[in-house]
Regions:
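Glycine- and acidic/polar-rich repeat regions and solenoidal domains
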Residues: 1-207
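C-terminal accessory segments
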Residues: 145-148, 179-252
């Protein structure tokens, strides 16, 4: 109920978590994974979060099949190390500065209403690291669906994805389409979809918190598959796993 609170926060030295099937709503960082290594997040619903998922100074966080409603997914890294840190030992429990990578973001569903204008996916690092950390934070970003109705009368699209490192003065670039992302980084979102759709055309009853898919979203032929151990943790069949977001495919 506190407007500036975090939801589920794994802070400092966590390893290889399997975190599935939950609903987080109305927090600043609904799921926060900080200074840690290894987590799989799947089957979550994030609603009205400043950041639905926030990954900070961590490595190997795999985010599969979650539903984001008016919520951003954010992966961040900065210069923080144990030397002269105000907590000292905290950064020493996680990956070193040059190891904060290896993330996966796949088969998620990100949907916004007309009032939401923020980017839906963010990878950010400060300018001071641009020359030293040149590899991307993620090893795979693919098969995600971004649904946002185009603003009436808008000549340009709203920001969709923030990418860093980038060859800009700020080390960050903001893109408004998946086509622009593929032009910049062809390996990203080869099977992603950007839809000009409202929440009411995607979900069974968004006004009532019913975020099951109204109709299946057709998958692309070569998009990533949900790993078997994650599918089993969710209790899904192989058919169920052909879905986007947190709710399984219902053949009926």
């Amino acid at each position: 109920d506190h407007p500036n609170s975090n939801g589920v926060w794994y802070d400092v030295g966590n390893r290889d978590g399997l975190i599935v099937n939950n609903w987080l709503e109305g927090a600043t960082d609904c799921f926060f994974f900080e200074i840690s290594r290894g987590a799989t997040v799947a089957g979550y619903v994030f609603v009205d979060c400043d950041k639905g998922v926030r990954v900070l100074n961590s490595a190997d966080v795999h985010v599969y099949n979650n539903t984001f409603v008016d919520s951003t997914a954010a992966f961040e890294r900065n210069e923080r190390i144990a030397t002269n840190d105000h907590f000292g030992w905290h950064p020493a429990t996680g990956p070193d500065v040059d190891e904060r990578e290896g993330h996966i973001f796949a088969n998620n569903l990100l949907v916004t209403g007309s009032a939401y204008t923020q980017p839906l996916l963010r990878f950010e690092q400060p300018t001071s690291l641009c020359d030293t950390l040149t590899r991307p934070m993620a090893t795979q970003v693919d098969g995600n669906v971004y649904a946002r109705a185009r603003p009436t009368g808008s000549g340009t699209g709203l920001p969709l994805i923030v990418i860093s490192p980038a060859a800009t003065e700020s080390c960050v670039t903001t893109l408004t389409s998946l086509d622009a992302l593929r032009e910049l980084a062809p390996s990203l979102e080869a099977n992603g979809q950007q839809l000009d759709r409202t929440p009411a055309s995607i979900f069974k009853g968004p006004d009532l918190g019913r975020y099951e898919l109204l109709q299946p979203i057709v998958a692309r032929a070569r998009e990533p598959k949900l790993p078997a151990h994650v599918r089993e943790a969710l209790g899904w069949s192989e058919l169920d796993a052909q879905t986007k977001g947190a709710y399984p495919m219902n053949p009926e």
